[in-house]
Amino acid sequence: MKKKVNIYLFSSLLLISFSNIFCQENTRIQIDSAGFFEKDDIKFTNATILTRNNKNKVKISHDGVDMWCNQAFFYEKKNYIEAYGDVILRQGDTINLNSQYLEYDGDTKIAFASGKVKLTEPNSILLTDSLYFNRNKQEAFYNNYGRVIKEKQDTIDSKIGNYLLENKKYEFKINVLLKNPKYKINTPRLDFYTENGHAYFYGPTQIKSKESNIYCELGYYNTNNDTGYFIKESKVDFNNTTILADSIYFDRNLNFASASNNIKIIDTINENITKGNYAEIFKNKDSMFITKRAIIASKQNNDSLYIHSDTILITGNEQNRVIRAFKNAKIFKQDLSGRADSIHYDKSNGLAQFININKQLDLSFTNSKKPILFNFNNQITGDTIVLKFEKTTNKIDSLLVFNNAFILEKDSLGTGFNQISGKSLQGKFNDNELRSIDIIKNAES
């Protein structure tokens, strides 16, 4: 008896399941209203011709959508309709599809619209010549160019587009162009979320504006607040400054960028190249800092001046540029090298300062970090060393050493050394070579 009950219950459930499937697959298109009904089996076999009157359009409904048009051909056996003239398809209270022509299959729930197609949702408008709308998948698709308008200022053009209604996401492919009054984005593929304005691009992409040009092959841009994050072959051009890095964060409103890993910053105005592994660039303030194996190379006539340290801070415009190198700073030049805890170079007065670390630290550690310079056969040390460069030629003009000045010089025979010490030291250069020295107070040799 128990087996019979189970079999009966299973059979009933199976019958109900098949009934549900059958009902779902055969939901019929409903004709809600029309001005005129007619049949013409000679011209339109098996079709009912529905036409509007002076007051109202033809109204049709099917499983959650309502349709209006001037005229419709209804194929009841096929559960299929063709609509003509000022067609409107409305799904819920958020999706409106306008066109001049519409085909709709009640069994597959697939619609095809053509002629001045306009798809409207709360955050965007899609314009195209023809569009497929799959209600089962809740996807709309075009393949013959379309334009999406967002908030009356952003437009996105592409040859192919796919809109996922549930995710509020567009997928654009081939010749994609996003236009904004401030910038343009050209890319082969772009995913765009209408609700939050986030754009994700794939492949060679350019973002152009008056203030900057950006290139990457994988990235993201927030069209609502004008910030972006770019990876893979990332490059940002700020007029005369080019930033290359593995990844770059960008804020258009602040004219700010931060970069990470394998950074190279080219400054064509000041003729220098800066490298490191993390940097922040404040273009409006003409400033930046770079850290993690930071190095800056500045062109000086036929030579280059290199400054290397843990962190480098650069501020000021071309005439007032200041370079500050912190912690384990080193300087290299064809005829000069040196190191200190910190190096401070001011282009406006041509002074480069080699600064000792805090004197309150352990004496042995302090002495090991004392500034030191090498120039041809000379080695110079002191608590603080100041080099003065000629501003026009960038040649070294003079030298000042404050406190515990010491100079070691190889003698003219090359067999020994001369050494001089004192409280302070002054030196003069000729063709970048130290030629004369004056010791101030407590001179010893």
Describe each region flagged by the PLM.
Residues M1-T27:
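Bacterial Sec-dependent N-terminal signal peptides
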Residues F22-S445:
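N-terminal amphipathic/hydrophobic interface segments
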